[in-house]
Structure formats: C-alpha cells, structure tokens
From Swiss-Prot:
Topology class, membrane: Multi-pass membrane protein
InterPro entries: TMEM127 (IPR033331), TMEM127_TM (IPR046795)
Domain of life: Eukaryota
Source organism phylogeny: Eukaryota, Metazoa, Chordata, Craniata, Vertebrata
Keywords: Acetylation, Cell membrane, Cytoplasm, Membrane, Phosphoprotein, Transmembrane, Transmembrane helix, Tumor suppressor
Native species: Mus musculus (Mouse)
Name of protein: Transmembrane protein 127
C-alpha cells in the first residue's frame, strides 16, 4: 500500500495551509488613543500661540486681552505701568507657559508611542497604562488652576485701579483657557482608550512569539507543499 502524496512533510512535520500562515498578533499601535492625543497637542500649541488668555474690562489697563505670549521673553513696561499686571502675575503666566510646554512634550511622546507601538517592555508598559496621557491631564489641570489664580490677582488689581469711579470690573477666561481644558479632555479620552483596551497575557504573548519564531525558522517553503500535493502516487507493489 502507499500513502497519498502531500499528506505531510519529511520527519512527520505538517505545514499550515497558505491561507492560514499568518499568526494572530496583538498590535501595539492604537489609533483610538492616537487621534485624541493629536488633538491635545494641537490644542496646547494653539493655546500658547493665541494671545487671548484673559479678558479684562473696567480697569485702567489699555489692553482688553492678556496671554502668556505677553510674558515670554521681553515684557512690555506699559503692561506694568498701566496696571495690567504685576510681577506676581507675570511669574504666574510664565509658570502657566512652562506647564503648557511640558504638556506638549508629554502628549507628543504619548502620541508617538501610540502610533509606532514599540515592543520594548518599558515603553510597552508606559503606553498600555497611558502614563504620558495621564501626565498631560495633570498638567492641563495645573494650568487651569494657575489661570484661575492669575485671574483673581488681575481682578483685584483692576478693582484697585478702576478706569472710572463706579466702573464695573470683571476678568473672564478667553480662548486659550478653553483650549487647554479641551486638551485635557482629549487626553482623558486617550487614557480611557488605552486602559479599556484588551491586551493578551504574558503567557499568550510568549506563545505567539514562539509560534512566530517557528514559522520563520521553517526550512520548507510554501511551494513545497503545493508541488507535493500534485505528485503522482508511487507504482503499486505487491
């Protein structure tokens, strides 16, 4: 009797069919968290560039809007002379700018981890547990807190130096403040997308890596099985 050709390979090894040669691998990339991360980066960069951070009304200050761009580098002496701000307010706005820069760096690093999905254990843990996104959220919350503090200081200064006696003085938040709040919200969404995603266990990852290495080290090409299937059976021998 004879065995039909193509049933197996020498040494009793069987090959996977061509349609099922790919192993199910868990990609480390995450588009669901990369998109909110990109929105967070854009919002923080726009908030830094936008001059409107606080609206001022009713004081002697000739400016109606103040922002962190007014205190980066050279500070116009007229802002201090017109009682638009004081040295403490300048320091607070610079601290706000510093936290915005840190938020951009953290959000950018989180975005790169989500897009490229590195396999290094430390980077993998950092991405899966969304450490960079969480830091971005904390920095946005810090910026919001310092912004409120700066608005209270500016409001107190404007009330001491009203434009007219009996003028209504108020200070409100402008575009940049809400952009930072939106960046924090986007980072929260990115954090949720990473933390709620299902990942394989360590044993499952090791099994997938072992199967992948076995396939890569298989010396028999895929064409061997196809050719072997069409070989004629050997001649009958009694």
């Amino acid at each position: 009797m004879y065995a039909p050709g193509g049933a197996g390979l020498p040494g009793g090894r069987r090959r996977r069919s061509p349609g099922s040669s790919a192993l199910p691998k868990q990609p480390e990339r995450s588009l669901a968290s990369a998109l909110p991360g990109a929105l967070s980066i854009t919002a923080l960069c726009t908030a830094l560039a936008e001059p409107a951070w606080l609206h001022i009304h009713g004081g002697t200050c000739s400016r109606q809007e103040l922002g962190v761009s007014d205190v980066l580098g050279y500070v116009n002496p007229d802002l201090l002379k017109d009682f638009c701000m004081n040295p403490q307010t300048v320091l607070l706005l610079r601290v706000i700018a510093a936290f915005c820069f840190l938020g951009i760096l953290c959000s950018l690093s989180a975005f790169l981890l989500d897009v490229f999905g590195p396999k290094h254990p430390a980077l993998k843990i950092t991405r899966r547990y969304a450490f960079a996104h969480i830091l971005t959220v904390l920095q946005c919350a810090t910026v919001i807190g310092f912004s409120y503090w700066a608005s209270e200081l500016i409001l107190a200064q404007q009330q001491q130096h009203k434009k007219y006696h009996g003028s209504q003085v108020y200070v409100t938040f402008a575009v940049s403040f809400y952009l930072v709040a939106g960046a924090g919200g986007a980072s929260i969404l990115a954090t949720a997308a990473n933390l709620l995603r299902h990942y394989p266990t360590e044993e499952e990852e090791q099994a997938l890596e072992l199967l992948s290495e076995m396939e890569e080290n298989d010396p028999y090409p895929a064409e061997y099985e196809v050719i072997n299937q069409f070989q004629p059976p050997p001649a009958y021998t009694p």
